[in-house]
Amino acid sequence: MYQSTLKTILLASALLILPASMSAQKRKAAPKKAATEQVGKPDPNFYIFLCFGQSNMEGNARPEAQDLTSPGPRFLLMPAVDFPEKGRKMGEWCEASAPLCRPNTGLTPADWFGRTLVASLPENIKIGVIHVAIGGIDIKGFLPDSIQNYLKVAPNWMKGMLAAYDNNPYERLVTLAKKAQKDGVIKGILMHQGETNTGDPKWAGMVKQVYDNLCGDLNLKPEEVNLYAGNIVQADGKGVCIGCKKQIDELPLTLHTSQVISSDGCTNGPDRLHFDAAGYRELGCRYGEAVARHLGYEPKRPYIEMPKQIEVPADAFIAETTVPGNEFPKVDKEGRAYFRIAAPEARKVVLDICNKKYDMQRDGKGNFMAVTDPLPVGFHYYFLNINGVNFIDPSTETFFGCNRESGGIEIPEGSEGDYYRPQQGVPAGQVRSIYYYSNEQQTWRHAMVYTPAEYELAKNAKKRYPVLYLQHGMGEDETGWSKQGHMQHIMDNAIAKGEAVPMIVVMESGDIKAPFGGGNNQAGRSAYGASFYPVLLNDLIPYIDSNYRTKSDRENRAMAGLSWGGHQTFDVVLTNLDKFAWLGTFSGAIFGLDVKTAYDGVFANADEFNKKIHYMYMNWGEEDFIKSGDIVKQLRELGIKVDSNESKGTAHEWLTWRRGLNEFIPHLFKK
């Protein structure tokens, strides 16, 4: 039983925050509690405030790190419900920290109201709050004469919250207030309610009735105990309950001892109904400042950790990979990328891009923002890690990479990148999404097929075309070359310039979407993606030759691939020289190759090989971790004709592979 006056706080150990799911033996220590100084006499320097209302008093925003620490023994809470996970017992004072209302509620204005009074009032004065609030409750729910009828019409989702207060929130508030009066003096009443009663002309009168009941039941003097009513979310005039603002502003006309706490400029969550964490802090400070002035003290604000503001240059432009209608991601002229995501409930958001992680910063409006270092030109995958889980940025187009759907951003090159961009006046080919049945795997499979612009012209109705089978890399899929690689634009531009002959390009999944699990051994490498080879040879090629106007002989069939797709290209072409006459790899994942004996000694007779393979090309990036320079050197020493190029300033990335494709295709199907 709490006694008449407050003494020092018991239990010197700090609060241990443990998950609620842990066993009782591992739960946190009980919160610090107050002891008594004098028995039977209220402490005149212990100021108590009653807090009631609906969801914005209950608290809707997730508390952040600065909200979870107690401001010390001068700010106390008498819980209105038991909260075992925090060691709280109903009716027993403890140090106040979020959440104040009930388990699973959020940050409330009362949190920073108390902190503001601690900062503003003399050190010998303590602050205590009693907090009873229910999301969505009508003001009738706090009227003793109306509660029984209200219980009959209350929505089902509210009944559990009502039951937490024994179906009488007003009675719970008064019972605890009477107990608290043995320890201190009630100095004010804080209310945030009205959204549910928007447009109700009787609302102000019912608020006055609640206030009068409290004053009567607790023997309070109205001239000494004001009611402080916070206004609703405004959201620049677009708040869901903006119609309630006027009736709250006019409350003092009915209740002369009330004061309205402005919510102008208080930030809100995306629902435009509830404040976000920054908005609750600001509104809470305003409650505290109003009370401090009423008590005769100059208000002082507690320290609030403000979000770091990220300035976006005026010349920053929306990335081409951004979903239309979104403002972010953006890129500036230095190649820095700017990201923003609305995540008002998130604790931590991290941007993961280009092998670097950036802690995203709150902007005070429910968003997280980040700016990167200058990024290399080209395409980059990225993820947003929210509370420890990777998510795709909803503002960006999606791309299959990293073994899953991913976010991506393009950092643009200058005019040197025009070869992979669509150009006005250049006829555009088609990229078709097709499904075909694989007898090898007894299932339907998906492929992408590029046909040149002239393929559909009536004059070419009988013309046949050579085919390039083009493979993606590990962790990607058949859409990679047309989405990340811009293959179709490379083909269109090269064909329009007369640099490449019109050809069909077929892109299929190489069965290497999932991570490589074969271990660091030759057998594992040989097996990874090998299931695709019989599908390609026995299902896909026959399907393409049957359904498209192809030239179906080996002289008119090429294969190329990037990274592991280059490995697959070697495996397929070098063991099927009766079916392919052209070969290319871009950052090809070709390891441990003994050129003298590989593939049954296919390179041993250079003259014979050079007759069968009309053109062989290998490229890699200057900063690539997979380089083919040594293999090229060894092949040339054997007399094998192989063209090669090192892409300047690029790594194992799509810009390397775009360049490789652009350099490869002009040599195809020409004798």
UniProtKB/Swiss-Prot annotation:
The Enzyme Commission number assigned here is 3.1.1.-, 3.1.1.73
Q: Do you know which InterPro entries this protein is assigned to?
A: AB_hydrolase_fold, Esterase-like, Ig-like_fold, Ig_E-set, Mycobacterial_A85_antigen, SASA, SGNH_hydro_sf
Induction cue: By growth on ester-enriched corn oligosaccharides.
Q: Does the keyword Ribosomal protein apply?
A: no
Keyword list (alphabetical) reads: Carbohydrate metabolism, Hydrolase, Multifunctional enzyme, Polysaccharide degradation, Signal, Xylan degradation
Pathway(s) where this gene product acts = Glycan degradation; xylan degradation
Extract the signal peptide range.
1-24
Q: Where is this region: Carbohydrate acetyl esterase?
A: 1-296
Recount the entry's temperature dependence annotation: Optimum temperature is 35 degrees Celsius with glucose-pentaacetate as substrate. Active from 20 to 50 degrees Celsius. Still exhibits 40 to 70% of the maximum activity after 20 hours of incubation at 50 degrees Celsius.
Catalytic residues (positions): S55 (for acetyl esterase activity), D271 (for acetyl esterase activity), H274 (for acetyl esterase activity)
pH relationship of activity: Optimum pH is 6.5 with glucose-pentaacetate as substrate. Active from pH 5.0 to 8.0.
* GO BP: any one term: xylan catabolic process
Feruloyl esterase: region residues? 297-671
Q: Name one GO molecular function term.
A: acyltransferase activity, transferring groups other than amino-acyl groups
State the reactions this protein catalyses.
feruloyl-polysaccharide + H2O = ferulate + polysaccharide
Free-text note on domains in this protein's UniProt record? Is predicted to have two esterase domains corresponding to distinct carbohydrate esterase families, CE1 and CE6. It can be hypothesized that the release of acetic acid is related to the CE6 domain, while the release of ferulic acid may relate to the CE1 domain.
Q: Which family does it belong to?
A: In the N-terminal section; belongs to the carbohydrate esterase 6 family.
Q: What does this protein do?
A: Involved in degradation of plant cell wall polysaccharides. Bifunctional esterase that possesses both acetyl esterase and ferulic acid esterase activities. Has deacetylase activity towards acetylated xylo-oligosaccharides smaller than xylo-heptaose, as well as from glucose-pentaacetate. Is also able to release ferulic acid from methylferulate, and from the more natural substrates wheat bran, corn fiber, and XOS(FA,Ac), a corn fiber-derived substrate enriched in O-acetyl and ferulic acid esters.
**Could you tell me what this protein is called?**
Carbohydrate acetyl esterase/feruloyl esterase
Organism per entry: Xylanibacter ruminicola (strain ATCC 19189 / DSM 19721 / CIP 105475 / JCM 8958 / 23)
